[in-house]
């Protein structure tokens, strides 16, 4: 990704997604209160923002040659679709997939939706990593499906233990930005 595009994405995140307070008022999914909140849906649900994230994340994952990329719904969904689009435009299609928080209660009762086959190499996506628990839930579902997880790829690493928790499971974490770079 061109440095100019990365800088443009960083500016968009700072302007639209990063919320900063004097006191810890933002409750994170981990239950912890924080002074900082990163709401990447303000970027991924915007055409330009989703394109920039798709392009940047594609550049991050493509060297690992995944067959597919996806993660826990809802944060990873637009990122997976954007990567799929950008990868197709580069004549290197990477399939998107979605991991439900729980297996579907009817029909095929799948937890993972996508055109996947056991044994395929997948990149697990995350919008923001804090403790890594959401990413690890997706990793577990992928492994149970028989997929080879090559890494967790995040837009933002909050630098609050997520990297260490993910790496304890033998999975590397790659991120476009660390929270400290955006403050």
Curated annotation (Swiss-Prot):
Assembly with partners or alone: Homodimer.
UniProt keyword Glycosyltransferase present: yes
Matching Gene3D superfamilies: 3.40.50.2020
Keyword Zinc-finger: no
GO molecular function: magnesium ion binding; orotate phosphoribosyltransferase activity
Top-level class of the enzyme under EC nomenclature: transferase
Metabolic or biological pathway, per its Swiss-Prot or TrEMBL entry: Pyrimidine metabolism; UMP biosynthesis via de novo pathway; UMP from orotate: step 1/2
Family of this protein: Belongs to the purine/pyrimidine phosphoribosyltransferase family. PyrE subfamily.
NCBIfam families attached to this UniProt entry: pyrE
SS bond partners: none
Residues binding 5-phospho-alpha-D-ribose 1-diphosphate, per UniProt: 100-101, 104, 106, 126-134
EC number: 2.4.2.10
Keywords: Glycosyltransferase, Magnesium, Pyrimidine biosynthesis, Transferase
Gene Ontology biological-process entries: 'de novo' UMP biosynthetic process; pyrimidine nucleobase biosynthetic process; UMP biosynthetic process
Catalysed reaction equations from the record: orotidine 5'-phosphate + diphosphate = orotate + 5-phospho-alpha-D-ribose 1-diphosphate
Function of the protein: Catalyzes the transfer of a ribosyl phosphate group from 5-phosphoribose 1-diphosphate to orotate, leading to the formation of orotidine monophosphate (OMP).
Protein name per its UniProtKB record: Orotate phosphoribosyltransferase
Cofactor: Mg(2+)
Binding site for orotate: 130, 158
